[in-house]
Amino acid sequence: MTDVPTSAPRSTSKSEFSHETVLLFETVAAVLGEKSLNDNTPKHDGNYVDATFGRGGHSKLLLNYLSDDAKLFVFDKDPEAIDVANDLAAEDKRVIVVHDSFADMTQCLNSRGVSQVDGIMADLGVSSPQLDDGSRGFSFMRDGAIDMRMDTSRGQSVGEWLQTVDEETLADVLYDFGEERHSRRIARAIKGMTQYTSTLELAEVIKQAHPKWQKGKHPATQSFQAMRIFINNELGDIDSFLAQSLTLLAPQGQLAVISFHSLEDRRIKQFLQRHSRGQYPEDENLPMPPQRPRYFSKPKRIAPSKAEVTVNNRSRSAWLRVATRTDTPYNTDPSPQHS
């Protein structure tokens, strides 16, 4: 067996920015349906998906536990991530690179002759290289164009959007996607800017407009998060991704998803609850109330270890949610099924 790394792999990106993979061993073990990883962990056959390749930390470790006949489909919208993925695919024929959103996972897999997979993993949100590279516009600590697009080859940047959006809509975005309580005040200040070209200038305007700063947290944190989530349709993509897992995962297939803030985690939690509890209608007059099918079992949430948080501070807000697909075929009819 190939030696397993004892720490998260460093990025092999052509850029100078590195990335420490969060919940590395826990995620790979979960997507394989293993309690832990060691030298006795068997090689797994089948098809697997890394829905957010990034710099490939999870994928590289997972490949150590896949058989020669297995396939790993890696998705990402970011052209820089795709460059890294293509380098990996050139070295390992089991890797198939898909430059697309995980929201289009089913279509992309079907076009490649794949209708079901044995495991799906995703690491949501923005990556360390994206944050550390000021030119991408994600960071309020480094200067750059106000971009924030995951895929820089298409779509409108945040800076372009800010030029045309009205104050009320901007305030709604800051509140809905950043849970920013002072959204109206901040939106008014942002719309008072004469140009939208510098992330540091934008961050300073937000900072000055914010009436109450939380200790240890930059006042622009939630506003930058909100604009990034909105411009990339991140929550809509997550909803689509989760829904597709119902039909893509084979019986006993594994779903493992890492999130970094409450808006993401709440969606994943509610999705797994809805499809694992077999909810009953509220009708006490029924002698044997109909039950909805259970499409997932054993949902659980895993936090990073204290040791990982000490080494990688960015992991402190991460949560990994995992679940196992049941044998029940997915029924698109919303009416309850009788037991």
Can you describe what each PLM-predicted range is?
Residues M1-S339:
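S-adenosyl-L-methionine-dependent methyltransferase catalytic core, i.e., the SAM/SAH-binding region
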